[in-house]
Design a protein with these regions (language model features):
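Extended, charge-biased low-complexity segments
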Residues: 1-70, 75, 85-114
Length: 114
């Protein structure tokens, strides 16, 4: 298992020149911490070679769908992060107007704006 701070640094290096949806997915996992710290997630979803570390989104989807033991909210965060990483909702091709509309809808979804 890789040290958390080292893994965060390596993942951020990987996403530095990556698509925004991948950076968003990785940052969500980093900020949440739960999955990045879990040895099972690291073994199943994080790949590395001599130069870099990355998240294999296909394996991360399989991991999430396999029934990993976690709270409902932890699973929801993982599911959202994987969906972002996979570009499931095609954010990478959204124009500015749709991007703003989607961001506003997501911001309102938890009911925090009341």
């Amino acid at each position: 298992m890789t040290d958390f701070d080292t893994l965060v640094r390596l993942l951020r290096r990987w996403t530095h020149n990556h698509d925004p949806h991948v950076r968003a997915a990785v940052e969500l996992l980093i900020e949440h911490e739960t999955w990045i710290r879990r040895a099972g997630f690291q073994r199943a979803c994080i790949e590395k070679n001599a130069r870099e570390v990355w998240i294999n989104w296909r394996k991360a989807r399989e991991f999430a769908d396999s029934g990993a033991v976690a709270s409902t909210s932890e699973m929801a965060v993982l599911d959202l992060a994987v969906a972002l990483g996979e570009d499931r909702y095609k954010f990478s091709i959204m124009g500015p107007a749709n991007s703003r509309m989607i961001a506003q809808a997501v911001a309102r979804a938890p009911g925090e704006d009341r």
